[in-house]
Amino acid sequence: MSLFATLKRLLRGKSSQEVELEYLISHGMHLGKNSTINSGCLIDSGWPWLISIGEHVTIAPNVTILAHDASPDVVACGTKLGKVSIGNNVFIGPRAVILCNTRIGDNVVIGAGSVVTHDLPSDGVYAGAPAVRICSIEEYRQKNRCLMETRPYFGDIRRWDDWRESTDEEKELMKRQLEDGCGFI
């Protein structure tokens, strides 16, 4: 089959992100059940077999995951390679960078813009460049449970992914209720 025919078959009805994800998986990347990789993510396509993503993982938009580091090559030392392992029940915030040779445990939240340069143990919330532990996952849960008792809950309006169906009145109500802080869906 010609390259053009192969590309045409691969692209039929699929987004470029779906095609990229299929490529990564077919070349050895592990992606667990119920895991989501949002748009704009850059996952190292040169070394996909070195990357493992667990179950129930959400990777927010524009996250970068690298299994190599070419910076040593600048001083003629070669390119460094290392496995990236992301555990189960993990949220990685937008624009975070996960560098090679890192392991992220289970039940972890990584804040937006964080740079993961070393292993992150399970049951923690991490943020910063480099990422450092902010609190335990249980402290984070408790903080949000307390907030949910006093802040607006929009579950009765629409699910977050159905916002396009919300009426103008529902959108205005949400804006007013969020004037002085956050809410939940």
Give short role names for the model-derived ranges.
Residues 17, 67, 71-72:
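Short juxtamembrane and helix-loop transition motifs at transmembrane-helix boundaries
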Residues 72-78:
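Flexible, solvent-exposed loop segments that connect beta-strands
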